[in-house]
C-alpha cells in the first residue's frame, strides 16, 4: 500500500468584495502537495503575514500591483522552511522569507526567497518590525518625513506595526510624538510601552479639539496610513513646510463611493500651496527596495538594543485567515497580525 501524499490547503479568492470583504469572498481548496522540479524548492509555511494592502489586491481596479485572479491563491508574505530542495543554494530545514501566500505549501524557484539564518530567534518578526511594515515605517519617516529634534510628529494607527515603529523612531530622533489610535487600551500601550508623549482616541467626539490641544506648536510631520476624519483634524494644524508621508488609507479601502459632505480638495490644495507642504505617497518595494540592507542593519541594531518595542498578535491555524483578515480591516487587531500555519520544528 503506497504512502499517503501530503495535502496542501490554500485560500483562494472566490469573488471580489463590494465594500468590506466577507467570508464568502474566500474559498478553501485542498489538493496534493506538488513535487519540486530541477532548481526548485518545496516550502512549508510556518507564519503568514496579514496586512491591509491585501484588500487592494482583491479588487480589479488599476493599482501599483496586479489583482489576485478569481480562483488564485491570496497573496501574502510568509516565513517558511524548506522541506525538499533541488536548488544548490537551499537545503532542507532552511528558514526563508518569501511570498507563498495563504497556503500550507508552495513551490519556489528560489529567486524571491531570503534566507533567515539557521536558528532565527523570532522568525515571525521578519514579517513585521524587521520586514515590510518596519521598512515602510523607516523609509517613510526618515526619507520623506525627515524628522528634526523638537518637531511634532503625529502618527495615525499608532499601535499598528507601521505606526508603532514610526512613533518610536520619531522619539529616537528627538520628536514630540502624538499618536492616534482606537480605544483607551491602545492609547495606554502607545504612551506606557512605546514611549509616545500623547495618544488620542479617534473615537472621541471632541477628537479634533484634543488634537489641537496636544499640538500647541502645530504639526511638522503627519505619517498618514488611515485617512478620513483623522486627516481632516490634522490639516488645519499643519505648519509651514510640513511633511506628510502617505503609505496607506485604511479608512477608505472598503469604500464603494466618495463619502458625503463638502468637497475638501480645494482646502487641501490651498493648504499644500500656501504652507509649502510636502505630501508624498510611496510604495515601499518599488521606491526603496534598493535600501533594504540599510534598513535591516539599523533596525536590527535598534531591536537588539531594545530601543524599538514590538507587539505581535498571533492566531493559530490557516483556517482562521479570512476571519482574522476581516477583523484586521475593522481595526480589531492590536499589533502585527500573523497566522501561525504550522509548528516551527
From Swiss-Prot:
- Write down the CDD domains for this protein, in alphabetical order: PGDH
Task: Name the EC number(s).
Answer: 1.3.1.n3
Task: Enumerate the catalysed reactions.
Answer: tetrahydrocurcumin + 2 NADP(+) = curcumin + 2 NADPH + 2 H(+); tetrahydrocurcumin + NADP(+) = dihydrocurcumin + NADPH + H(+); dihydrocurcumin + NADP(+) = curcumin + NADPH + H(+)
Q: Where is this region: Disordered?
A: 1-24
Asked if the keyword NADP belongs to this entry, the reply reads yes
- InterPro entries assigned: ADH-like_C (IPR013149), ADH_N_2 (IPR041694), GroES-like_sf (IPR011032), MDR_fam (IPR045010), NAD(P)-bd_dom_sf (IPR036291), PKS_ER (IPR020843)
Bias-annotated ranges (Basic residues): 1-10
pH dependence comment: Optimum pH is 5.9. The enzyme is most stable in the pH range of 4.5 to 12.0, with 90% of the initial activity being retained even at pH 12.0.
Amino-acid positions noted as binding NADP(+) in the UniProt annotation, renumbered to this chain: 186, 225, 333
One of the entry's Gene Ontology molecular-function terms is:
curcumin reductase (NADP+) activity
SMART domains documented for this protein: PKS_ER
Q: What class of enzyme is it?
A: oxidoreductase
Indicate the temperature dependence noted in the record: Optimum temperature is 35 degrees Celsius. The enzyme is most stable from 10 to 50 degrees Celsius.
The way its activity is modulated is described as: Inhibited by thiol-specific reagents (p-chloromercuribenzoate and 5,5'-dithio-bis-2-nitrobenzoate).
Q: Which UniProt keywords apply?
A: NADP, Oxidoreductase
Q: How does it assemble?
A: Homodimer.
**Described function:** Catalyzes the metal-independent reduction of curcumin to dihydrocurcumin (DHC) as an intermediate product, followed by further reduction to tetrahydrocurcumin (THC) as an end product. It also acts on 3-octene-2-one, 3-hepten-2-one, resveratrol, and trans-2-octenal.
Q: What protein family does this chain belong to?
A: Belongs to the NADP-dependent oxidoreductase L4BD family.
Q: What protein does this entry describe? A: NADPH-dependent curcumin reductase
Tell me the name of the encoding gene. curA
